[in-house]
């Protein structure tokens, strides 16, 4: 999930890190879809080596999208996932590795957050279903129109959790998908593909980071590998910085707020379930042929360049006159660590640090002021120096009281402005709004009479008569609004607002008033603030959490069992004496098994994904762990406005009690359930042209059961071990499609094998530093001393990945195409929206015309109706431009001169006009062929040139 609002804050503070993706769309010819050839150079002017997919960020929007109707069944969900991966692949076009990672069993520290999310999702889903049924009954009772309710099972997104049948089926589908692409897509032919499905323990993004860390530790690793990671979580940014790779890019879908969402009752856009009135759907198109079209556009992708973010951070964190050598890599690690205080997936954020209030900037300023006293950096390769952190936190604690007061002042000021705004709107709005056919509308609005009603007044009158005749409940004093809904003939009386402001949630802590610390501990922890021992325990747990999270980001999971046992965080002023606290963790811990994790994170409403005897433990009143599964629970808004921002007060799961209860039901598992309950590993795939393919086939021929080292020279330096896969995909064996609508692979040439990353000792420390031989990318940001050192040269900003990329130019054929397809103006032969090419146009992409003018009609034949060249010229070409008084006739066109001197060539199938044979823009205030006055030029003629001869 990451840190809420972190990406928005980051992209606003450091805008140059964002680059829009250039995406080549598939083409369609005669009804046949032509896929994108990903083997061609990347249109983004950059070549990526490795692409990593955090698959859960793909699975969720494909299975239950928010901006379009959901897939009808599981098969459609799988196809949607395949298409989404194809889009990403065609944008990034990796040349070495594709790594797909699905969330497996998470550490215990993450399970608390997963448990909260799933309980919330179940509760909100049940409430939404009840509300939907209530509104449906009300609408039908009033005679409203609703489409028949489909009898289908509601998709429970909680099934996207390791151990469920859905995730097991997804792994099978992805195996088929990879084999299909390796067989048929030229962009995949030399690619190494690794799939880490839900059976492999660990979160998806951390499995990716663990792979990168272990490969970087190998002596033959390429330090200039260009990585691209796909995911929308904000913590991916910090994980990417933690790798210290010079070439690291994140691709994510661009967030666009206020996307239209269809109503769950009538499937129409523009309102929610609570506002649904059951009105008939407006016909789209003459014959309703556009009924299935959606008003939402396909999402766009953006690149986030971490190398540019590193430049920003280097500028911001650079400090002079330090008592120790400045190291930008260490300072970036400290910045990542400070971001943990404003929130992460494992710890609640400190009450005084809100990212929307500039908490990170405040921490950085305090860090730069205090670092001279600390004597060094806060972190080193994932380990925290608590003595130095204590100095930072106590400095934050000194300003906590002023932070709370300023927050209250800002909130009060915002409420006053909103109240004044509502008063102005109420004062400016008329109390009486006319309606009906003659309703006045603003000019140019979509609902104006000229756009809808007046376009066919007879049809509107007919519909009104039919509506009145067929609806006895509608009185004669009723008219119809532009959307077809009945409204009083005289108009609509606007309802007075019930209140000037929304009710504010009750806040018993009141952090802005004296005594805030005592009230906080009493309300949140139910203890007295004077209980120093308890406060020390809370701070100790939070400090352990900070150390655990940093080590998780830089070294891997320090303990699978540790978790923060409270719902709330302490204050920064409570961090006194943390230098003496221990930050060691129990070694040798193991992750939960998949079904055990389901029991720890699922509510009873999602028990259908568990074996029968297991789910009984969730609902049986006599169950020893029934208290883990409350049917309802409180949500503490904790000073926030919306429920999703609040804290779900769920009981923590006691691991010992849970395991003891499960021991009694373990014998009830079937062989299939036992298989799904086991932990798995990664699988590597290659195609027939990959150098590693023959080596893998030899392993299957020998039947060796011992792990074999991967030859790095055959797969771009990747190291690890191979072991035979019991469910292997092998050549000359049919790969059956798990999706009925997709074909089987009868001539398979791909091969798969189990893969394991290089192993290290438990106390091994991965160095958080840039590798020797790594080359930093060219600087993107404008140097601070540019004005002094540039000798008057103008700074040229870099808009994409390549500073030397050529600007986009259109050749003469493209301009002619625009001239043909652009709507024409009225009254004269002009293209109203076509800009003239510049007279000195010399595009880098210029190419001379094909030999023989007879080829031009063939070239344009796919853009014009058939045989359009044989008929008389269109009206806009029959019009003759008026020549200036005394002007001489034009000389004939000289191809040789044109080819030598011009990037544009006259088109003999069009009239002569401006440069390149293009007519000028229409100008009603001027006459003459080039916009000159009709009485002729007022200045001497220009000298003759080889390009045009006007005489």
From Swiss-Prot:
Tissue: Expressed in the spleen, testis, heart, brain, lung, liver, skeletal muscle, and kidney.
Superkingdom to which the source organism belongs: Eukaryota
Ranges annotated as biased composition (Basic and acidic residues): 920-938
Name of this chain's protein: 5'-3' exoribonuclease 2
Phosphothreonine modifications at: 439
Family: Belongs to the 5'-3' exonuclease family. XRN2/RAT1 subfamily.
Species this chain originates from: Mus musculus
Alphabetical UniProt keywords: Acetylation, DNA-binding, Exonuclease, Hydrolase, Metal-binding, Methylation, mRNA processing, Nuclease, Nucleus, Phosphoprotein, Transcription, Transcription regulation, Transcription termination, Zinc, Zinc-finger
Function description: Possesses 5'->3' exoribonuclease activity. May promote the termination of transcription by RNA polymerase II. During transcription termination, cleavage at the polyadenylation site liberates a 5' fragment which is subsequently processed to form the mature mRNA and a 3' fragment which remains attached to the elongating polymerase. The processive degradation of this 3' fragment by this protein may promote termination of transcription. Binds to RNA polymerase II (RNAp II) transcription termination R-loops formed by G-rich pause sites.
Modified residues (Phosphoserine): 448, 471, 473, 475, 482, 487, 499, 501, 678
EC number: 3.1.13.-
Modified residues (Omega-N-methylarginine): 824, 847, 851, 883, 895, 947
Residues covered by region (Disordered): 408-508, 907-951
Regions of compositional bias (Polar residues) in chain numbering: 445-458, 467-485
